[in-house]
Amino acid sequence: MATRRDLVVGLAIAPTIPLLARSVFAQEAEATPADKLETSQLVYITPIKSNGEESRCKAEIWFIHHDGDVFVVTPPETWRARAVGKGLTKARLWVGEFGVWTQSDGAFRDAPEFMARASIEAHADVHAKVLAAMGEKYAQTGWGRWGQRFKDGLVDGSRVMIRYAIASGGQQVDE
């Protein structure tokens, strides 16, 4: 049962709730796209076709922001890896967490956005650094299950690492 004291304390702090909420929203609004690369668990990716249009294929995927670029690990038969193999190296990336892209009702499109140039990263030393960083980032969200698969896959060819070099200013990617 609530006491008179509980009521008085509740009434005393109630006016501060909107101020606290505004402060939290203001901090979120002040976050830059680069900040989101450090805090988000997912990036949404689509290749840009040769005619300049986005591919119909998009996906949400684990990533790591390392040395200014975004890295993902994926099977070589996925559309994002095949696009790079076909020379479709321009890509658009959105950073945020909206669940499965097909069920997000396009919400990811309002997230911070980057244009990037994709390439297959083949250097074992880069693989090791990126996987170590991913292990730290995803330690609580499934790395125990996926980390060794990523590492083994990069060795046996069942996975590739894609580097997305973010365009200067995040906007245009030169030809």
Where are each of the predicted segments found?
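Short, structured beta-strand-loop surface elements
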Residues: W79-G169
